[in-house]
Amino acid sequence: MPTVNQLIRKPRVVPVKRNKVPALQANPQKRGVCTRVYTTTPKKPNSALRKVAKVRLTNGFEVIGYIPGEGHNLQEHSVVVIRGGRVKDLPGVRYHIIRGLLDTQGVKNRKQRRSKYGAKRPK
């Protein structure tokens, strides 16, 4: 434990907190327009074609958002809403596109965890 004199000479430094989702600007979600919809491959032990979209947000930021679930209807100029949440095996993808909102349709034939994928209750 440092002495009072040591603390006067060199005070304690509070570590700087880095914002993980800067483009949201402290909002829960942001609206944007897809500028490019494409697939990309994940980092090393995994292998797949992950669906992602480049989105220009209303605040001018351009971010990459992950499209969750099986199948989607997004194309260029689709209006989407993004939320925070990175995809661990896709470098640079720090946002998720919310399904079942604006131009994004929910996942078809989804029985479980439906609210996460914008799917209506099956009859």
From Swiss-Prot:
<dbReference type="Pfam" id="PF00164">
    <property type="entry name" value="Ribosom_S12_S23"/>
</dbReference>
<dbReference type="GO" id="GO:0000049">
    <property type="term" value="F:tRNA binding"/>
</dbReference>
<dbReference type="GO" id="GO:0015935">
    <property type="term" value="C:small ribosomal subunit"/>
</dbReference>
<keyword id="KW-0694">RNA-binding</keyword>
<dbReference type="InterPro" id="IPR012340">
    <property type="entry name" value="NA-bd_OB-fold"/>
</dbReference>
<keyword id="KW-0820">tRNA-binding</keyword>
<dbReference type="InterPro" id="IPR005679">
    <property type="entry name" value="Ribosomal_uS12_bac"/>
</dbReference>
<protein>
    <recommendedName>
        <fullName>Small ribosomal subunit protein uS12</fullName>
    </recommendedName>
</protein>
<dbReference type="InterPro" id="IPR006032">
    <property type="entry name" value="Ribosomal_uS12"/>
</dbReference>
<feature type="modified residue" description="3-methylthioaspartic acid">
    <location>
        <position position="89"/>
    </location>
</feature>
<comment type="subunit">
    <text>Part of the 30S ribosomal subunit. Contacts proteins S8 and S17. May interact with IF1 in the 30S initiation complex.</text>
</comment>
<keyword id="KW-0488">Methylation</keyword>
<comment type="similarity">
    <text>Belongs to the universal ribosomal protein uS12 family.</text>
</comment>
<dbReference type="GO" id="GO:0006412">
    <property type="term" value="P:translation"/>
</dbReference>
<dbReference type="GO" id="GO:0019843">
    <property type="term" value="F:rRNA binding"/>
</dbReference>
<keyword id="KW-0687">Ribonucleoprotein</keyword>
<dbReference type="GO" id="GO:0003735">
    <property type="term" value="F:structural constituent of ribosome"/>
</dbReference>
<keyword id="KW-0689">Ribosomal protein</keyword>
<comment type="function">
    <text>With S4 and S5 plays an important role in translational accuracy.</text>
</comment>
<keyword id="KW-0699">rRNA-binding</keyword>
<comment type="function">
    <text>Interacts with and stabilizes bases of the 16S rRNA that are involved in tRNA selection in the A site and with the mRNA backbone. Located at the interface of the 30S and 50S subunits, it traverses the body of the 30S subunit contacting proteins on the other side and probably holding the rRNA structure together. The combined cluster of proteins S8, S12 and S17 appears to hold together the shoulder and platform of the 30S subunit.</text>
</comment>
